[in-house]
Structure formats: C-alpha cells, structure tokens
Amino acid sequence: MEIQLLFFGIATDLVGKNAMLYKIEENSTIIDLKKSLISNFSELKNINEFAIAVNEEYAEDDLIITNGAIVAIIPPVSGG
C-alpha cells in the first residue's frame, strides 16, 4: 500500500525533500515504518526521537497505518 510522508525541520534536510509517496506492507505499524525508513534513509537513525503524526494526529508505535494515510515526521523542537 502507499502512504504520503511529510518531513519537517531537520528531517527535510536529512532526506532531501519535504514530501514523498512511500510504499509499506499492509497492516504496518508506526514501528514497522520507522524500521523501514531507517533501512532506506540511514540519516534517520535517530527517528525514535521524532514525533510521528498520522492524518494530523500524533501516533503511538503500535498504530496500524491505513492505505493513503498522510504521515508526518516531526523532529524534536528546541530553542528558547
């Protein structure tokens, strides 16, 4: 199945784009997606520190991703 990935902040710089279509297996969870992204983009090795939102709602690692979902990869925010 196919999902849309949106990258924000440093994630955009690491991947080299701010959005892309991405294929995942049916019944994949957020943790499955993280493993796949690390495998395909070694620059995202610290993705476990990032927040993940699916269809504009923050998601836990065990959430099953549905076909056509919009998944945002949001790095930690720092500053003051």
Residue ranges and their predicted role:
Residues 1-78:
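Ubiquitin-like/PB1-type beta-grasp interaction modules and other compact soluble beta-rich domains
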